Structures are given as structure tokens and as C-alpha cells.
UniProtKB/Swiss-Prot annotation:
It comes from Rhizobium etli (strain ATCC 51251 / DSM 11541 / JCM 21823 / NBRC 15573 / CFN 42). Pfam families: SDH_C, Shikimate_DH, Shikimate_dh_N. PANTHER family: BIFUNCTIONAL 3-DEHYDROQUINATE DEHYDRATASE_SHIKIMATE DEHYDROGENASE, CHLOROPLASTIC (PTHR21089:SF1), SHIKIMATE DEHYDROGENASE (PTHR21089). Pathway: Metabolic intermediate biosynthesis; chorismate biosynthesis; chorismate from D-erythrose 4-phosphate and phosphoenolpyruvate: step 4/7. The gene is aroE. The active site is at residue 75. GO terms for biological process: amino acid biosynthetic process; aromatic amino acid family biosynthetic process; chorismate biosynthetic process; shikimate metabolic process. NADP(+) binds at residues 87, 136-140, 160-165, 225, 248. Shikimate binds at residues 22-24, 71, 96, 111, 227. This is Shikimate dehydrogenase (NADP(+)). InterPro entries: Aminoacid_DH-like_N_sf, NAD(P)-bd_dom_sf, SDH_C, Shikimate_DH, Shikimate_DH-bd_N, Shikimate_DH_fam, Shikm_DH/Glu-tRNA_Rdtase.
Length: 285
């Protein structure tokens, strides 16, 4: 995109600390170019102690941004500082998408929508069963549990090494969510139609524990929110055991859609060319 189009605005951001690793500028830049829209989307690193001032500059109009994405470690504070967080952000206690509207700073969390949209695209019918297993109870698991519950699953078994963390999630998300220690994994997998890894196991090619997926339903789907590498050890194990798998890259791509539409006025499409662009970037960085 040439500079003249960028200076016409609107301008959006992704902020975190650090932020240089973010692929969001590549995603949104692709959409701006393919849709022929004016504006820019750029990485803007903000240290934790400077984040309240950054939000204040959005609210008072002294920055040139109309909104943007928020990533680690600012998601919880972004939620607290927003004027109008929506119901999704309220339940999660975190937001990843901000926009100015009617003089107020609005906030939502699109991670769950990215998760379900990825599965809808890559494996339609993934939600035909009513039982899911979520492996891990860290911050990343919240949006997954929320999205799976809201899609209509009746039982969501959260399995974690520290069962107290899983119990906190069960308390937060209601009676459909049940907490279990790792030792109960095989038991709670019985007949489940969805298995989601929300841990960092296998990230950057690290080893992951061996998991016997045999207790899952024969047509179950195994997915991983880790997308580096695309084919994580957990996905490889599941595929070798004859199950359908969905990698986590699409979650990153689809979670970006609602924000882009808010800032730039058109709903973008996650297509094969965008996925190929990000995969190529992953191979060199």
C-alpha cells in the first residue's frame, strides 16, 4: 500500500509488550490492500506502566488511532479501562479489540469467535457432539470455554495439572463446565466429540506428552490453539490415531475479522491467499 493511502486514515494498531513478533500488521495490511481501502494498521509497543496513558490518548483524541488490537500483557487492563466493554469481555475479564464510537471507548474479545470460525471453516460439523475436553486452564482457555459453551455444548471438561485453576474456570463459566486433574483425562475423554489443547505444550517444536485419543468419539475433532508449528505434536498424535485435526492458525486469522470491520467499515474474508502469506512468513521468522 502506498503512503498516500495510509495518510488518508483511519489508523488502527496492535499493542503489547513486546509486540515486534505480531503478525497482525501482515493480516490487516493484506486486507487493506486487497479491498483497496485507505488507512493503516501498525504495531505500537507500549510498556505496562505506560498503558493507562495510551488508553487516555485514545479517549481524548490526542492519538491518531480509532481503535486496535490488544495482546499480552494488556488484555485485562484494556477491559478495565474501556468505557463500554461488551458482555463477552465482561465474562472473560479481558479484551483484545478496542474501538471508538460516539465518543466512548468500546471493548470486546474476539478470541472465541476466531476459534469457532476456524473450526466452522476447516471442519464443518465439528459441533455435532455435546461434550468437549479442554486441556489446560490458563488464560488462553477462557475464551475457548466461553465459545464452546455458547455454541451449545452441554458438558465441557477442563483438565489441568493444577485442578484448582480448572475449578476457578468452572465457577466462572457455570454448571456446564467441570474441573478435573490430569489423571482423569482418559475418563473424561470418553465419547467426547471435541478435544482442544490450550496449553503451550508443543509450542516451537517442544515435546508433548503422549496422549491416547482412543476414548474420544470416532468422528471427534482435535484442535490446538498453538500454531507454531502448524502441525503440533498433539495434532500429529491425534492424526496418527485416525482422528480429524484442525490447526490453530485459522483462529489467529478469524479473530481479526470483527476488529477490521469496526475500524475500516468492510468485513474481510479469510482466504487461502492470506493463510499462505502468514505460513510463508512463519517459515522465515
Amino acid at each position: 500500500m502506498d503512503d498516500s493511502r495510509e495518510t488518508l486514515g483511519p489508523n488502527a494498531f496492535v499493542t503489547g509488550f513486546p509486540i515486534k513478533h505480531s503478525r497482525s500488521p501482515l493480516i490487516h495490511g493484506y486486507w487493506l490492500k486487497t479491498l483497496g481501502l485507505p488507512g493503516s494498521y501498525r504495531a505500537h509497543e507500549v510498556a505496562p506502566d505506560a498503558f493507562p496513558d495510551f488508553i487516555a490518548s485514545l479517549k481524548d483524541g490526542s492519538s491518531d488511532f480509532i481503535g486496535g488490537n490488544v495482546t499480552i500483557p494488556h488484555k485485562e487492563l484494556a477491559f478495565r479501562l474501556a468505557d463500554k466493554p461488551d458482555d463477552l469481555a465482561h465474562e472473560l475479564g479481558a479484551s483484545n479489540t478496542l474501538w471508538l464510537e460516539d465518543g466512548l471507548l468500546h471493548a470486546t474479545n474476539t478470541d472465541g469467535r476466531g476459534f469457532t470460525a476456524n473450526l466452522d471453516e476447516r471442519h464443518p460439523g465439528w459441533d455435532r457432539h455435546d461434550t468437549a475436553v479442554v486441556f489446560g486452564a490458563g488464560g488462553a482457555s477462557r475464551a475457548i470455554i466461553q465459545a464452546v459453551r455458547d455454541r451449545g455444548f452441554r458438558e465441557i471438561h477442563v483438565v489441568n495439572r493444577t485442578v484448582e485453576r480448572a475449578r476457578e474456570l468452572a465457577d466462572r463459566f457455570g454448571p456446564k463446565v467441570r474441573a478435573h486433574p490430569v489423571g482423569a483425562l482418559a475418563e473424561v475423554m470418553h465419547g467426547a466429540g471435541l478435544f482442544v489443547n490450550t496449553t503451550s505444550l508443543g509450542m516451537d517444536g517442544e515435546a508433548a506428552p503422549l496422549i491416547d485419543f482412543a476414548p474420544l468419539a470416532a468422528d471427534a475433532v482435535v484442535t490446538d490453539i498453538v500454531y507454531i508449528p502448524l502441525n503440533t505434536p498433539i495434532l500429529r498424535q491425534a492424526e496418527e490415531q485416525g482422528l480429524s485435526v484442525v490447526d490453530g492458525l485459522g483462529m489467529l486469522l478469524h479473530q481479526a475479522v470483527p476488529g477490521f470491520e469496526k475500524w475500516f467499515g468492510e468485513r474481510p474474508v479469510v482466504d487461502a491467499a492470506l493463510r499462505a502469506l502468514i505460513v510463508a512468513d512463519m517459515e522465515v521468522h
